[in-house]
């Protein structure tokens, strides 16, 4: 049988063996002692035709719990959002289908312009001056922000709010360990950073203060109150933010943030089992030469035509490895393109409307749950996620919800022992009133 990906015929094999000077394929392994050779049949299924294989893999895929078959109220950093149809069409074009920013930019003007537009839109959302072409994800972007802060201030202490996503905090701690930085976690009160505890830890040795906006619990951190505390010790103010929320919230840049990072997954990137995603990284203009990753700039050629180039490349490892501001080379250019196309398709008004729908639907879900006797421990304003307290273990409740065709919320107790039996519920613009009402009813039944 001639296989599509193994096109060699028996005649081809005989000809190759003849040229090599052996009689059979077994002769190629003559140097391997008989005592260590495997004898018998390998535990491998027989070959199948493409239609047979397609049916088998489709049957396996049908066993997956995805958002096409289940209604999802799970968020915690990865969200079920609307993706405009045009996104997949554009990113599937052969000119774009790569994770790399090009090394020969003059022959990739279309790709560079798309990345330039991504950078521009991130700056508009965050209120910052400069954004790079992308990072791996939100967690690594935040860790790189910490490293930039430490290098810029020449200080070793990092104040990290416990309301920052637990996985982001783990990545930050991993990076900090290698650089011998001291990470101090700031506790929370009523679901937001404890300002008094933050003041107590502030001193002249602090490189940066890190908060999330909205934070892991969905709460809106009081950036206006945090900023003067963060800058009191000549430290840097770093904010990790959901870019969709910035479509309606005041951008961190207007509160005096020095670095704003986050994950662009809400724009055009599927949930896809948690990755790959696309981190973004934006800074004030004073930090432009210390920002990690690639930067696309706009210029003019000698004939006055607009063009795009990779600029300030001396920061990068392929130019000066020992003095590079980061070692990111390949990045998430394809996902950055997806985010750029999604934001363009939605437009400023569409992004704002989408963000408003998240707030409205999440607020409706919270109010309905409160009506049905659920306790919401954090009273402050939130974006599209909120925490509720259950009477039973979250894992047990989620198992029962799954049987009803619902993917329940995140078990907060996994990361916060003091919040056992608390569920983080995400409600995006895709959830209908009927789906929310059904979820409230089923959660109430599980709760009883």
Swiss-Prot record:
Concerning Pfam families, the annotation shows: GDC-P
Q: Which reaction does it catalyse?
A: N(6)-[(R)-lipoyl]-L-lysyl-[glycine-cleavage complex H protein] + glycine + H(+) = N(6)-[(R)-S(8)-aminomethyldihydrolipoyl]-L-lysyl-[glycine-cleavage complex H protein] + CO2
Keyword match Oxidoreductase: yes
Keywords of this entry: Oxidoreductase
Enzyme Commission number(s): 1.4.4.2
A single MF term (Gene Ontology): glycine dehydrogenase (decarboxylating) activity
Q: Name one GO biological process term.
A: nucleoside metabolic process
Tell me which Gene3D superfamilies the record gives: Aspartate Aminotransferase, domain 1 (3.90.1150.10), Type I PLP-dependent aspartate aminotransferase-like (Major domain) (3.40.640.10)
The subunit field of the Swiss-Prot or TrEMBL record says:
The glycine cleavage system is composed of four proteins: P, T, L and H. In this organism, the P 'protein' is a heterodimer of two subunits.
What function does the entry list? The glycine cleavage system catalyzes the degradation of glycine. The P protein binds the alpha-amino group of glycine through its pyridoxal phosphate cofactor; CO(2) is released and the remaining methylamine moiety is then transferred to the lipoamide cofactor of the H protein.
Of which family is this protein a member? Belongs to the GcvP family. N-terminal subunit subfamily.
What is the protein name given in its UniProt record? Probable glycine dehydrogenase (decarboxylating) subunit 1
> What species does this protein belong to?
Geobacillus sp. (strain WCH70)
Q: Which gene encodes it?
A: gcvPA
